[in-house]
């Protein structure tokens, strides 16, 4: 009879602290709070993204402390360490935004580095701002040690139901003389009342919801207020749950399967989530060695409706969804309709179906989540477009409010700042297709988000009159007729590089087409005469990212 091999929950820490030869390691750990008994416990690293850089993360040190309590009370030894965060909202529209996507890779690399070096047996990662979520998950799945992600939680609405996007759009209103300087200053002072991630179904809330649907967070972790007893309890429970994962040897790659990624895509479509989910889920799948492709979003999107009336395209904020029950009743609706894989394993140690078994439906009186047979849009708002402008794909977010097609004449800009200046100075008119190029992963480098120009378009009252296309990306707060992630990007010789002012462009979201309506012979001649610009950076982290980054359709990954 074969003897059953028991999993050692101290698989990694034992190599660091066990035996007489590891006395120097133990000596270093006594001053940071270890007792002799602690060396016999599984060590759990708590990766905190705390920072005073942004309100999204300013409270996460307290959440890390709560997580530590949960680990230590359940027989583990928790060690808190930090990784970085940047603020998309603060750097948006500036040269600094080029570092945003880079931060995803730095977060992943730093978590992998610390945990790999220190020999932690398990990990709990806590994130707030947009790139924290995919960065943490990429780091966790590379390590493939028992792990959980905790979302820092959503911010409360500002006064008069405002948020950060309200401020961006107010800039356009000010330029349009719709509001004055005093009104603009008032909006900037009231829009962001305290800690938590940006309040609509923007990138942070989108990715938190995706990670929960993926199975890497505890139930409803994605739908809790940043400052709340629920969020504190979520952290304590995550600390407890990671010990259960250690004892059962359940690791991220056991959870993050192709079917789990399909669940994540389904949920973010139903919620009306950010285009950034396409980029980040592909990157997360790549780290997990799951063969998720950009066209999988089209396949899944054909059968999943948009049912959440959430900002930016809708009316409500995440904190209002929290009040009616969060994301769990929505997931139960999708499961009961056969749109989710209920047999996927999650960090509870149970399947998704088991987690949702006793979830009650939303109250009939609520207006945020619609019934599946009465959707906002009958299929996905995330459209993967192809055509001569995007032979390898582009991503649009079309809810239907903008219409389903747009044909107009190009106005071309090689920097985001130039496009924004043109919008604010009334150089964009009805029927224009604003083309912002050389903003891709390599060309930017860093694939900046175009929230400043798209918000200016909205503030100017042009939201339903113009379109914007780019090889950069969009904030989750962007709405309007916009297409991003155009691949191949301009810097790599994509057709986007040779679009000229006045060229006619067709965006057809119904048939998933993005086409430059110029004869192929003319396009070929332009490409023959095109010369690649000099790189914007030749040293430093941006230059490094430009050398390593793959295309947007491949998640802009660097490994």
Swiss-Prot record:
InterPro entries given in the database record: DHAD_IlvD/Edd, Dihydro-acid_dehy_C, DihydroxyA_deHydtase, DiOHA_6PGluconate_deHydtase_CS, ILV_EDD_C, ILV_EDD_N, IlvD/EDD_N
Recorded metabolic or biological pathway in which this protein acts: Amino-acid biosynthesis; L-isoleucine biosynthesis; L-isoleucine from 2-oxobutanoate: step 3/4; Amino-acid biosynthesis; L-valine biosynthesis; L-valine from pyruvate: step 3/4
EC class: lyase
Presence of the UniProt keyword Oxidoreductase in the record: no
Cofactor(s) of this protein: [2Fe-2S] cluster; Mg(2+)
Pfam families per the UniProt record, alphabetical: ILV_EDD_C, ILVD_EDD_N
Top-rank taxon: Bacteria
Binding positions for [2Fe-2S] cluster per the UniProt entry: 56, 129, 198
Metal-binding in keyword set: yes
Modified residues (N6-carboxylysine): 131
Catalytic activity: (2R)-2,3-dihydroxy-3-methylbutanoate = 3-methyl-2-oxobutanoate + H2O; (2R,3R)-2,3-dihydroxy-3-methylpentanoate = (S)-3-methyl-2-oxopentanoate + H2O
PROSITE patterns assigned: ILVD_EDD_1, ILVD_EDD_2
GO biological process, one term: L-valine biosynthetic process
Complex and partners: Homodimer.
NCBIfam families named in the record: ilvD, PRK00911.1
Family: Belongs to the IlvD/Edd family.
Protein name: Dihydroxy-acid dehydratase
Native source species: Ruthia magnifica subsp. Calyptogena magnifica
Gene that specifies this protein: ilvD
